[in-house]
Regions:
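Glycan-recognition surfaces
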Residues: 1-72
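Residue-level detector of short, conserved catalytic/binding motifs and their immediate flanks
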Residues: 57, 124, 182
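Conserved, mostly hydrophobic/aromatic
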Residues: 59, 126, 154
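Aromatic- and carboxylate-lined catalytic core of secreted/periplasmic carbohydrate-active enzymes
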Residues: 62-63, 67-104
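Active-site proximal loops enriched in glycine and acidic residues that flank catalytic Cys/His/Asp
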Residues: 70-72, 127-130, 156, 188
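Solvent-exposed beta-hairpin/edge-strand motifs
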Residues: 144-158
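C-terminal beta-strand-rich structural cap/linker in extracellular carbohydrate-active enzymes
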Residues: 163-189
């Protein structure tokens, strides 16, 4: 992954490693220097539908792709992939052209958390990816760019929050499952 490659392609693989644990760290480090639009982030080799969802949430750190042999996939997996692609399209411009704010460092924390926002600060895609211990520990994920005077609707969870609440932090409780993820899509009302 180097700048010289950007002369020939605007998007490249950050790594051949698509396993979620290492991939979260790879994407975190890459995002400190490169925009998300340069990263090709793929879902591959899911063992279960829950694993497919977790890998999808990890791959939302950049340009989404799939590395699967679809003729061998079950109808449930194919249906879930169609849903995931539709969901990705809702956030694609925010991920590829928005501003990125890391909240948790996967090298020192039990996972990764970050958000993307648009220049107007009217939309926020917040992602939490747990990779290890501290099951049931509650974290506060603060969206410092939210306008404290505005109200935001979470289009995924269906709840409404004030900008002041987003700035103070959204509580998220970890899980005993080391591959636990959670997303929020806040839209200014």
């Amino acid at each position: 992954y180097d700048l010289g490659m950007m002369k020939y392609s605007t998007m490249i693989w950050t790594s051949d490693n698509t396993h979620p644990g290492p991939r979260i760290k790879i994407q975190y480090g890459s995002m400190l220097a490169y925009p998300a639009a340069t990263m090709s982030c793929h879902v591959s080799r899911p063992a279960t539908l829950a694993d497919l969802d977790y890998r999808f949430h990890v791959a939302l750190g950049g340009a989404l792709g799939y590395e699967l042999h679809l003729p061998n996939a079950s109808e449930a997996v194919k249906a879930r992939i169609r849903e995931q692609v539709r969901e990705y399209r809702k956030y694609e411009d925010l991920i590829l052209r928005g501003d990125y704010y890391p909240l948790m460092n996967p090298f020192t924390d039990v996972g990764s958390a970050y958000y993307f926002t648009d220049p107007e600060r009217s939309r926020f895609l917040l992602t939490f990816l747990q990779t290890g211990g501290n099951a049931f520990h509650t974290f506060k994920l603060c969206i410092a760019e939210a306008d404290p005077q505005m109200v935001y609707y979470d289009a995924i969870g269906g709840e409404t929050y004030s900008g002041a609440q987003l700035r103070a932090g959204i509580p998220v409780t970890g899980s005993a499952d080391t591959q636990y993820s959670r997303m929020w899509y806040f839209v200014k009302v």
